[in-house]
A protein has these predicted regions:
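N-terminal strand-loop-strand
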Residues: 12-64, 92
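Short histidine-centered catalytic/ligand-binding loop motif
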Residues: 64-73
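Short active-site-proximal "capping" loops at secondary-structure junctions
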Residues: 55-58, 70, 100-103
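Active-site segment of metal-dependent pyrophosphate-handling enzymes
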Residues: 25, 48, 78-81, 85-143, ...
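Flexible, glycine-rich phosphate/dinucleotide-binding loops
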Residues: 40, 58, 104, 144, ...
Length: 181
């Protein structure tokens, strides 16, 4: 099959864009930390992950994946490892980049506006766009009992997660899908 110049879609020239057309995009790193541990009263281990209670808006008081803005002096992997250590007090047994989540409508203000469950842009909404590079990590079962204890960090079985801040439920679902496949 050949494509003639007449059948090629028109592309707007780059000259039409100005610096003002580009909004700010922030980069964050989050980590889905998985560990096998038994539920209370059971012998067989199941998958658990630690969540962090948000101490500020947006989503103050809700649980979220450990993470935050990428610091200028950190690599992505360093930020993911730091997040894991801060949440659990442990070094990862395994750490790998899972996916980059960059939906334009990830911001809380944008996620609030939905039609039939699908997010829609909010005209004039002033929200910062955040792209999250998500890592997944595992902690050896032998070290789970040594994890850090803190009132704003709690381990949850993956089949009993609360409603998480931001799009973190979707991120966990994707991590579990990848783990199974």
């Amino acid at each position: 099959m050949s494509i003639s110049p007449d059948s090629t879609p028109a592309v707007e020239p780059y000259d039409d864009h100005t610096e003002g057309d580009h909004s700010s995009v922030s980069l964050a790193v989050s980590t889905v930390i998985l560990a096998l541990r038994p539920k209370e009263g059971q012998q067989h281990p199941s998958l658990w992950l630690p969540l962090v209670r948000r101490l500020r808006e947006p989503y103050k008081g809700q649980w979220a994946l450990p993470g935050g803005p990428l610091q200028s002096q950190q690599s992505l992997e360093q930020a993911a490892g730091y997040t894991l250590k801060r949440a659990t007090g442990l070094e990862p047994g395994y750490l790998e980049q899972l996916y980059a989540f960059g939906d334009v409508l990830r911001a809380p203000e944008a996620r609030a506006a939905r039609i039939n469950g699908a997010p829609v842009p909010v005209p004039g909404a002033d929200h910062e766009r955040v792209v999250s590079v998500v890592y997944w990590a595992s902690i050896p079962a032998t070290e789970v009992s040594q994890t850090r204890v803190h009132e704003n960090i709690r381990w949850f079985p993956v089949d009993e997660l609360p409603e998480l801040a931001f799009d973190h439920n979707e991120i966990v679902e994707y991590a579990l899908y990848r783990l199974q496949n």
